[in-house]
Amino acid sequence: MMNRFRKWLYKPKRSDPQLLAQFYYADEELNQVAAELDSLDGRKEPQRCTLLVSQFRSCQDNVLNIINQIMEECIPQDRAPRDFCVKFPEEIRHDNLAGQLWFGAECLAAGSIIMNRELESMAMRPLAKELTRSLEDVRGTLRDQALRDLNTYTEKMREALRRFDVLFAEFELSYVSAMVPVKSPREYYVQQEVIVLFCETVERALDFGYLTQDMIDDYEPALMFTIPRLAIVCGLVVYADGPLNLDRKVEDMSELFRPFHTLLRKIRDLLQALTEEELHTLERSLCVSQDVELPIRADTQAPSALAPTFSASLPPEETLSASANNPEAELACSMQYDDQELEELSRMVHRAGDEMSSLLSPPSACQSPAHRPGSEASPRGEASPARARLKSGSDEEERVFFMDDVEVTESPARPESPGNTFELTQGNAQQRGQDGQSGEVGVEAPALVKEEDWSNNNVEGDKIKLASLMGSTSCSCLDSQLYLDGWEVSAEDAETAEMIAHRTGGMKLSATVIFNPKSPTSQDSAVAAQEAPGHGTSPLEPRAEGTGDNSHKLSTTATNCLLHSCVCCGSCGDSRDDAVERLREKCGPGSVISASNPSVSLAKGGDKEPERIDEAQPSDVTLPAEDASNRQEPKAPASSKCLAHTSGPQVDTASRLQGEGEVKGQPEPEARKQDPEKSPVVSGDSPRGDVAQTEHQHLLGSSSTVGSCSLDNTRLDVATAAMPVTPMATREKIRSRFHGSHDLIHRLFVCISGVADQLQTNYASDLRSILKTLFEVMATKPETDDKEKLKKVTQTLRSAALEDCALCQETVSSSELAAKTRDGDFEDPPEWVPDEACGFCTSCKAPFTVIRRKHHCRSCGKIFCSRCSSHSAPLPRYGQVKPVRVCTHCYMFHVTPFYSDKTGM
């Protein structure tokens, strides 16, 4: 009864601006909507129910906002800390968050469960019940105080507000943490480091002229893509110790770049191989918002700063660029093949990590002949790949073997001896080239591969390299089965390079593709030994048996080499190449390293039965060499490859040494002229033509003797560990995998853009927050000194006089105006400009419309729009004591005493 009388007597007015009065009516409206919602049947009137729920949520927001204002006024020093709100995602930090939290607390208190958050819901239910009770106490206390005294805050009300504030802050953190991921302090600190990196990147871009200050001040939309791209480059190269430091743990990286850790490592290696000019070219291309083509460089070789030292030793008439004249060779060895590249780019947005990682490696196992470190091995600039790439999609692709630049068809058969020796025999062979064709690069891809077709491309060094690098070591990370024994394919079943390349999605290589559709597993494999012709001979000369004129046995180690080459990571092949380089430096060009492996055989065509190597012989076996007396040299000599694989940890170091394809002496044609008896041949007239005679005369140069440098595995490891690889060699090795400078920049552009643009999709909220902070920092101009500020303000005020303003032209001081006002001597107000005489705002020149109306300034009488005449001030000089409408100019310079005194200076 007393509350009813108090409500009737002390009920506040609706127009009362005091907070308790506003709360009273907001709470009344909330109770009315809640009562109507309780009495409504939502099944019969779903639309009405939806409308009331929306209205109820709005009323809750209004009540909580007023309570928050009361707490700011009542207990400003006792508020619960809410620093955790900075960790919330930006999309949930809005004005309606408090109402959503209230609604969630009521649902949890009533027994509801958050979907997929059962454990969190059960843990928060006691807190939600306590929060709802505290909120009801606060509402009752404030409503009671609004009926008593609107200007007084009792201690009871203060205590209720303190308790509610603490509970609401605790529930806010718990509820939001359960609904959305909240950053830990460490993650928040890392994100701040990313913000600093972005700011430093923009500073650097401004210094180099990539961006302009106007673009930042205008919030250019293209910067949302440009800045993250440049930040990746700066974070990997310029500020390598920052948040993109890849040498620390992956867990310590920002979650923005953590999924791209492996890809960023590859990008960093390629960026470090760039010159300064190439780096600037890449950064300029990353700043372009439109899809423009990268500038094509005229040179396809490495820049002068990274030019290899061996280029000067090549014959002038046979430079590296000459090898690019053959269009089919360029097609076979180039990295550019548009169809597959376009397909890669189209899938990049959805599979950024895998696809862009593959783009960083050459799409073909064959490198461009004009850009390989092994190009100096032959005047023709030919070299074989450092390693073969395998696609692990199917068994078919794992059983594809490419023989580099050699067109050969061989009928594979089971080896005669099941031990550690593999055999390769050859029947009659036909010579394709006649009368000097041996001096050309014979690169062809035959549509039909015949048994009799043997082509010599003068790639003896390539054969040694391919045999050694493919079969020297096996990578433990690739445990695929060896498809070796018991398969035999006729010439009709062999597929051409075009067919298999088309089916497997790879690039057409001008090489014979040996494909084995079905082959069982073999447990044994051996090391292939290449013959080294010279004056020194070896007592070991095992031979293989030829089965016929037109039937050829393929050593099954060819497939074994491919299956055991490391294709899952690039570091294995790189380390292998580094070991070969260090070994060559130690032993010299005239040394031959033999493996400490007794199972070394030379597969050679002939009628004799294969001879086994006596196991009682020493482990260090010198490479077998053959007398040159039994050889013949046709006009266009042909050769084949003897490939094998090591079944154990032993490494055929001789093959590895020769596999680099280094030429340490005179060119091959001159060597052939001096000693024609030492040239490798495969006689087409003799059924006992030599097969797999891979000699290294061009490796020895003019040296007539072959030295031997026998090392066991332990000494080899010591030698390789003692000689580190120089950074220049590493950069050259990386650059040699790409067709040229333009191709390297293009690959980096694609991958960096893919990673940066992927951030827009995966981490839109974090990136938006980072860019928002970035623009706030970078758009701020450097502040000047206070004296300079004062000078600028004074100059502005003095120059603020308008020529058409009568008040600016008068010379009466403010003191004289004040004296006239005290004496009651008022001036006549200025004449108003007629409405029909002005169709535009005097200040902003905006045309007047039905919506934009005309307003007269009471101080100067001119016509302005509402925006330019929004101020009100008394005009004592005209007798106007109450505030009247004045324009902005008059308000700033003629009405306010401070500015009026300044204008009188």
UniProtKB/Swiss-Prot annotation:
Zn(2+) 1 binds at residues 841, 844, 865, 868. GO terms for molecular function: phosphatidylinositol-3-phosphate binding; zinc ion binding. Its main location: cytoplasm. There is a cross-link at residue 87 (Glycyl lysine isopeptide (Lys-Gly) (interchain with G-Cter in ubiquitin)). It comes from the Eukaryota. CDD domains: FYVE_LST2. The keyword Protein biosynthesis does not apply. GO terms for biological process: negative regulation of epidermal growth factor receptor signaling pathway; negative regulation of epidermal growth factor-activated receptor activity. Zn(2+) 2 binds at residues 857, 860, 887, 890. Enriched in brain (at protein level). Belongs to the lst-2 family. Negative regulator of epidermal growth factor receptor (EGFR) signaling. Acts by promoting EGFR degradation in endosomes when not monoubiquitinated. This is Lateral signaling target protein 2 homolog.
